[in-house]
Every structure is written in structure tokens, then in C-alpha cells.
Amino acid sequence: MLVRENNSNDRSIIEYVIKILLISGISRIIILILAMFESIRHIIFHNDTNPSDARKFQMAICRLSSQKSRKLKNPIESSTTSHKKKGYVRKCYECLQIQVS
């Protein structure tokens, strides 16, 4: 009987240690994800960073959004937010924000 009790205690201790390791691993992943979002937010919204880095990041977002935007067949002159590239007009509000700032 003593041997069986020791085995069950050892199993419960091992299960407890495994649970602690799993929880700490999951919490580390969550902390890394939150740190990634914080660094992106810091680049976009804070002025104390290098402005060229923030501009490059915003231009990358602009390129991604313009690839998804609809291309018009006839170019239209627009003084607000249009880009002319290869005979198409692309509307991009992120680029307007960059031009204003």
C-alpha cells in the first residue's frame, strides 16, 4: 500500500509541474504577442521615434491597402486622396495622412 501511495503522489506532483510549465509557456506567448502589438502602436502613434521609420511603416500599410482597393479603368483627376499609377486611380487615406503631416 505504501508503494501505491507514493506512486500516486509522484504522479500528482509530476502533473502539477507539467501544468505549471504549460501555463508559463502560454503566458510567455501572450506576453510576446502583446509586446509585438505595443511596439507597432508605438511606431505609429508616438512622435519620439524616428519619423522615417513611422513613415515607412505607414507606407507599407498603404501599399497593402491599395493592393486590395478597386482599380478604376478610367483615370479621374482628384485633388484629395488619389494616386495615379499605370493609368489607374487608387484611393488611399493613409497616404493622405502622410501628406498632411
Curated annotation (Swiss-Prot):
User: What highest taxon heads this organism's lineage?
Assistant: Eukaryota
TM annotation in the entry: 17-37
Q: Where in the cell is it found?
A: Endoplasmic reticulum membrane
Task: State the protein's name.
Answer: Uncharacterized protein C2F3.07c
Quote a single Gene Ontology cellular component term: endoplasmic reticulum membrane
Keywords associated with the record: Endoplasmic reticulum, Membrane, Transmembrane, Transmembrane helix
* Chief localization: endoplasmic reticulum
Membrane topology per the entry is: Single-pass membrane protein
